Amino acid sequence: TFAYYKELEAGHENVRVVYYEGGFNYSKINNFGAAACRGDYFLLLNNDTEMIDGGCIREMLGYCMREDVGIVGAKLLYADDTIQHAGVILGFGGTAGHAFIGKSRYDTGYFGRILCAQDYSAVTAACMMTKREAFEAVGGMTEELAVAFNDVDYCLKVRKHGWLVVYDPYAEMHHYESKSRGYEDSPEKVERFNGEVEILLSRWRDQIEQGDPYYNPNLTLDNSDFSLRR
């Protein structure tokens, strides 16, 4: 990644690389990057992602330029071409979670939802485009959420300000999830994650308990396949 940054700096006059020197905090990193940006649209993108189609960014921008849209998320795939992200549903796991995890890239999903561009309550920030106007209106990302749920929180803030959050299935990337940072498998990481759960619930408990407006209450919250609630 860092070698690529140097290659970008050397080969493109219109590219400027800034370096964040602090410890890992996804919200702080993106707030730092946004403060250095000059454009009207920001692309938040993990370093463990890989484009499938070179037109992905242009595709997302097409939706993000609409006046009523504040955020656009992509369809993200594991290395085996199964779905890692196709939108986020409030209430999964008691907080929020990705829709259609593990389904085939070519699966249509519940009523074609994997393949249809649509509004969601949230999308992942592993690949998220957002308007500068929206980002600044809500004060950027919440820095108390260093790793988990900062994207969900940001999407809910933007929606509260009146913008839509759109999932775009035609913007596809591979996401080698947690390849760069590892999993939440140590006592310290588990404690931090549980703390971030509490922060999310302290901010959005009412919305989560009321149910996701883009999810049928007759469907289960126990897994991501949109099957009937038991």
Task: Identify the function of each model-found stretch.
Residues 1-23:
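Acidic donor-binding segment of Leloir-type glycosyltransferases
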Residues 42:
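Short aromatic/hydrophobic "clamp" motif used to bind/position activated sugar donors
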Residues 49-93:
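Conserved donor NDP-sugar-binding/catalytic core segment of glycosyltransferases
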Residues 21-29, 34-37, 51-52, 147-148:
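A short, glycine-/small-residue-rich helix N-cap motif at loop->alpha-helix starts
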Residues 20, 45-47:
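Catalytic metal- and UDP-sugar-binding loop of GT-A-like glycosyltransferases, i.e.
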Residues 70, 80-81, 92-119, 165, ...:
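C-terminal, non-catalytic tails of nucleotide-sugar-dependent glycosyltransferases
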Residues 25-29, 35, 91-133, 137:
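A recurrent flexible, glycine/aromatic-enriched loop bordering the glycosyltransferase active site
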Residues 56-60, 114-139, 143-174:
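A short, conserved alpha-helix in the catalytic core of glycosyltransferases
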